Amino acid sequence: MMASNVLSRLLPQTGQSVYETIRQHDNDSDASDVEERAGLVYDDDVNLGNRFSDRELEEAMADATREGSSSPSDTFLTPQIAQRGERSASSGPRMRKPNNPRFMRSVTPRPEFVEDDLDDDHDDDVPASLLMEGQHDDEYLRTRLPPPPSHHFSDPQPSRSARSPRREHIRTFAFVVGFTTFLTNCIDYRLVRTSKSLDQILISKCTSRMSASSTFLLWLLCLFWIGKIFQLILDIRRLKNMHDFYHYLLGVSDAEIQTISWQEVVSRLMTLRDANPATAGAVSAFNRRLLGSQSKQRMDAHDIANRLMRKENYLIALINKDILDLTLPIPFLRNRQLFSRILEWNINLCIMDYVFNEQGQLSSRQYTPLAEWKFREFNELWHLFEKRINLSYPYATRYVDQFPKDKTVQVAGFVAFISGALASVLALASILDPELFLGFELTHDRTTLFYLGVFGSVWAFARGMVPEETLVFDPEYALLEVIQFTHYFPSHWKGKLHSDDVRREFAVLYQMKIIIFMEEILSMIFTPFILWFSLPKCSERVIDFFREFTVHVDGMGYLCSFAVFDFKKGTNVIPQGHINQRDARQDPRVDYFSTKDGKMLASYYGFLDNYGGNPRATNANKRAFHPPPTFPSLGSPPFVGASNIGNRQDPIQARVNTASAALGQQSMLGATRLGALGVGDTQSPAPSLLLDPQHQPSASGFRATNHIAPHHRQRLGRPPPAPVSESIIDDNEPSIAAARRPAPRRKSGQLHTNSGSSEALGAGDSNVEDSWGMKSGGEVNDEDAEENVDDVVGGAGVLGLIQQFQKVNKDNRPRAAVGL
């Protein structure tokens, strides 16, 4: 057996090729693929077929071949490698006998092909990126080839940049432990007053005189420190692989790693993916079937974010839906939620690790850990979230300062005046005669310099509590600026941004640092009570949550259903408005299968803000200029002022109509808590270069519907509905509005208002289809075909229609009719 094993390694393989094995495996597994028959599979090819056909993909690839375009990965290769790759690709696959045995070679040999396989595959064009995988035996490539890439590339600072902070943390930890041990056990504080040097107060052999508890704690800290060192040593190989992946495959140098954006990294990952036929998206249907087993390697910005934030998306949904009971089981603190870093670590240990396996100033404020999880959106990486939240701190501080307590300000002003006057007199006297006055004792053993420091500190503290005289009292505007960055706008805040109730609720999320620090200290005492008494009450809801909101995506595994954005249709659905708010709120299914305060829709727009457009362009999150609102024209919709909050333009409109934050709950069922949209025109999101065709936002925005579809766990994998005819409106022409006579089959007259948004053009049984009598195939109902112009315009003719327009313009009334 030993000899046969050695001979099998030395002799070339005579079996079937790799492609033949893949083809045979796919043919055998077509009828028995468990994931294809599973109800939770999210089929990307269904959405992909809606946008591109195989013929279009083949024609695009043929055009690129005729034009002689090089492989996208050539930009990441050195000139020598690129030239050798071109020669190897032009000459076609060749049978090369390995010079050395396999166990003596550092790289994997190139697989040998049988001549029949070459004739069957008809694929002689080998991309240049594949020529890097051990196909050259010269010493140059052997030294330049990187190790197999690691999947831990979420942090855009690999290798040396990643090792430096960890080394500094280990050194800092060692200094803190050693310095604390020295201060607590090696100094005799009773001799400090009578001694003149440090040697007189030091305790010799202090470690041998330590107590048993101190010695045990010191040994534990030393073992922890040694474990951190071993962990860093073991991670050096992984960090080296990460460095090689960035340097050789992505073309990111060590100097560029500090300034490159994450969007640019994702763009280069997609370029590298397209250079590999196993992961390229623009392939024919035949080749896609052959490479079907490699679907796990296909990725874009959405797939990468879902992989990196698999656990975080679940925790975001748990916090958003108020599944976790975080109240203190204490009589006088039952309504207060405690969520510290220690409790977060315990929740990850008890819930997340069980579900998943391993395959400043004294008065300054900051957001609490609970507020961070409320503000964070699905598929939002930590460095992007941290950047967004840090931009909101100046506006949050200004909003909190908008509510000064008058009595506190008066007392602080009086104290600042007294302390400032005394400090000014002492400072002036010290300047006039410093030698005499600085040594002068105002009280026993208290000189002028001591009181100068005390009064100066009191003046600075009291002066900081007094607001500036130039501060404009406008809390509503200040909070709207905060919402621009936090994207947190509960529905019950609407119309109450100036109230003290909203201020108190926001102050719970934005507390002083000293209070957050005290909560972290007290959480070591209260965390066991929450884990023992409060969280067990919601254990059934936690289990139901993971069962109901988990879907299986082909190639990525199990994900949170809210994080799997359906960029075409299905999950993000906006109704047209025949379900009023009261009926929607009374439906418990809508509340259960939905996110609160439009969390999923806000995450969708936030994801497009981060990954939309050109990653090499300027910051996509830069606040755009919004011109002042215009007066309602003849073609204005009837809900002009519906989006005003306190007689202001909603700033969330800047995020491509994120007035959905005020819509209530965005549902996985296909309905929101507020039935009517009525918040202005919704523009279609722009396509992104970092998303595949199946993840691109549709041209008409979200699909519109006026009913609640039954929820099922197979909803994401269902085939798309039949197309519905939509009216084409010219943007350069004003919309014509007139009262339409109802069809004879309707019981009562009803005016179908034009929503003026892309959501109004929908599919299914929408009111657009009913009012115009359209069927799914674009046919016109017979009973509406005989309707003449006089019935539409009321028998007045063209002149009468013009008179109606003039009357509407004169009375300054909004239109209320459908376009002809």
Curated annotation (Swiss-Prot):
It catalyses: a 1,2-diacyl-sn-glycero-3-phosphocholine(in) = a 1,2-diacyl-sn-glycero-3-phosphocholine(out); a 1,2-diacyl-sn-glycero-3-phospho-L-serine(in) = a 1,2-diacyl-sn-glycero-3-phospho-L-serine(out); a 1,2-diacyl-sn-glycero-3-phosphoethanolamine(in) = a 1,2-diacyl-sn-glycero-3-phosphoethanolamine(out); a 1,2-diacyl-sn-glycero-3-phospho-(1D-myo-inositol-3-phosphate)(in) = a 1,2-diacyl-sn-glycero-3-phospho-(1D-myo-inositol-3-phosphate)(out). It is a multi-pass membrane protein. Residues 114-126 have a biased composition (Acidic residues). It comes from the Eukaryota. Residues 67-81 have a biased composition (Polar residues). GO terms for biological process: lipid transport; mitophagy; piecemeal microautophagy of the nucleus; protein localization to phagophore assembly site; reticulophagy. It is found in: Preautophagosomal structure membrane; Cytoplasmic vesicle membrane; Golgi apparatus membrane; Endoplasmic reticulum membrane. The chain crosses the membrane at residues 170-192, 216-236, 411-431, 447-467. Keywords: Autophagy, Cytoplasmic vesicle, Endoplasmic reticulum, Golgi apparatus, Lipid transport, Membrane, Phosphoprotein, Transmembrane, Transmembrane helix, Transport. GO terms for cellular component: autophagosome; cytoplasmic vesicle membrane; endoplasmic reticulum membrane; Golgi membrane; phagophore assembly site; phagophore assembly site membrane. Residues 313-333, 514-534 dip into the membrane without crossing it. The keyword Membrane applies. Residues 59-166, 711-787 are annotated as: Disordered. Residues 193-215, 432-446 are lumenal. Phospholipid scramblase involved in autophagy and cytoplasm to vacuole transport (Cvt) vesicle formation. Cycles between the preautophagosomal structure/phagophore assembly site (PAS) and the cytoplasmic vesicle pool and supplies membrane for the growing autophagosome. Lipid scramblase activity plays a key role in preautophagosomal structure/phagophore assembly by distributing the phospholipids that arrive through atg2 from the cytoplasmic to the luminal leaflet of the bilayer, thereby driving autophagosomal membrane expansion. Required for mitophagy. Belongs to the ATG9 family. Forms a homotrimer with a solvated central pore, which is connected laterally to the cytosol through the cavity within each protomer. Acts as a lipid scramblase that uses its central pore to function: the central pore opens laterally to accommodate lipid headgroups, thereby enabling lipid flipping and redistribution of lipids added to the outer leaflet of atg9-containing vesicles, thereby enabling growth into autophagosomes. This is Autophagy-related protein 9. The lineage of its organism: Eukaryota, Fungi, Dikarya, Ascomycota, Pezizomycotina. The gene is atg9.
